[in-house]
């Protein structure tokens, strides 16, 4: 397994491409923005995207979901408690794309020849989850405290 981190969007949210190096299949975690950046990486490395997994439904983690799902034909996974989450000041709502799937605490999702264990980690959002794949833990914003907003530096 190999992991490529792509900082995307104004908040430079980490989008992860988790790669099965034996099959060149991958899973995209939290495609928050810049679908072109994500797709360029997938295509330039001859990867076959098998799924999109979301740690929660905030705009900076789901902004490119529909574009990446449309271009790859991949199912999108999210915890049901975040499916209709308000994601922006404009009131824009995240809607699970057709063919989307729900996961919850304790589920094990086999995708791209890898297994992703789902751990419910509510708090940042009601449906927040963390994902374990082999020796990697993907937490989204679970460990983030918002007593202040930390923005990326230039």
For each predicted feature, which ranges?
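Active-site HxH/HxHxD metal-binding segment of metal-dependent hydrolases
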Residues: 26, 33-111
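Ser/Thr-glycine-rich phosphate-binding loops at phosphate-binding pockets of nucleotides
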Residues: 53-56, 121, 125, 139, ...
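Short active-site segment of divalent metal-dependent hydrolases/proteases
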Residues: 59-63, 127, 144
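Conserved catalytic scaffold of divalent metal-dependent phosphoesterases
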Residues: 81-83, 107, 114, 124-125, ...
């Amino acid at each position: 397994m190999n992991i490529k981190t792509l900082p995307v969007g104004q908040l430079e949210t980490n989008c992860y491409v988790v790669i099965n190096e034996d099959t060149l299949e991958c899973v995209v975690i939290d495609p928050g923005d810049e679908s072109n950046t994500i797709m360029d990486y997938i295509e330039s490395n001859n990867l076959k995207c098998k799924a999109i997994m979301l740690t929660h439904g905030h705009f900076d983690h789901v902004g490119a979901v529909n574009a990446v799902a449309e271009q790859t034909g991949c199912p999108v996974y999210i915890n049901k408690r975040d499916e209709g989450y308000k994601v922006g000041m404009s009131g824009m709502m995240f809607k699970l794309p057709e063919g989307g799937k729900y996961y919850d605490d304790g589920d094990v999702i086999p995708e791209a020849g890898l297994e992703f264990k789902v751990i419910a980690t509510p708090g940042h959002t009601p449906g927040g989850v963390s994902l374990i794949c082999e020796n990697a833990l993907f937490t989204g914003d679970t460990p983030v405290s918002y007593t202040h907003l930390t923005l990326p530096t230039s």
